[in-house]
């Protein structure tokens, strides 16, 4: 996946629009991911499980040495014009949502299933709220 994506990025900056679009469609079909070629991804970033289910906004910026789990969404929020900026050495767990004009600081860890709508300072850890059992009376 990483090699295919690097080739895809090279096509973005060339006159081979048909090939770039073909690769984009194949990434979507095979890996069910939506990673536009406009996304700025730093060096040595890794996507778990070949970026399965990952959705990124075209204007997202991801720093160096980040690790992103499967089914992660990083994008905007309704009514907001800016999108998330992810720092260096950030770990984002599976099924995490990072939405709106937020900045994730260097070295931060976003736990699996977390929903981030506020800035995360370096090197904070964000975890989702624990599950609760709700018993309804019959």
Label each region the model flagged.
Residues 37, 42-43, 48-49, 57-58, ...:
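Left-handed beta-helix
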Residues 1-33, 131-132, 138:
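Terminal amphipathic alpha-helical/low-complexity segments used for targeting or macromolecular assembly
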Residues 125, 134-135:
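Conserved protein kinase catalytic core
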Residues 74, 133-134:
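Short clusters of hydrophobic/aromatic residues that line enzyme substrate/ligand-binding pockets
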Residues 11-12, 55, 79:
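Alpha-helix initiation/capping motif
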Residues 12-13, 52, 94:
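Residues at structural and domain junctions
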């Amino acid at each position: 996946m990483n090699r295919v994506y690097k080739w895809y990025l090279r096509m973005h900056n060339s006159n081979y629009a048909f090939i770039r679009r073909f690769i984009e469609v194949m990434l979507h079909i095979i890996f069910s991911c939506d990673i536009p070629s406009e996304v700025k991804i730093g060096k040595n970033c890794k996507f778990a499980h070949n970026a399965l289910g990952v959705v990124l906004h075209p204007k997202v910026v991801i720093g160096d040495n980040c690790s992103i789990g499967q089914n992660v969404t990083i994008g905007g929020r309704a009514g907001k014009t800016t999108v998330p900026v992810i720092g260096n050495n950030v770990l984002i767990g599976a099924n995490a949502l990072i939405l709106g004009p937020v900045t994730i600081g260097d070295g931060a860890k976003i736990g699996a299933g977390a929903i981030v709508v506020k800035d995360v300072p370096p090197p904070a850890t964000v975890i989702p709220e624990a599950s609760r059992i709700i018993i309804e009376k019959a």
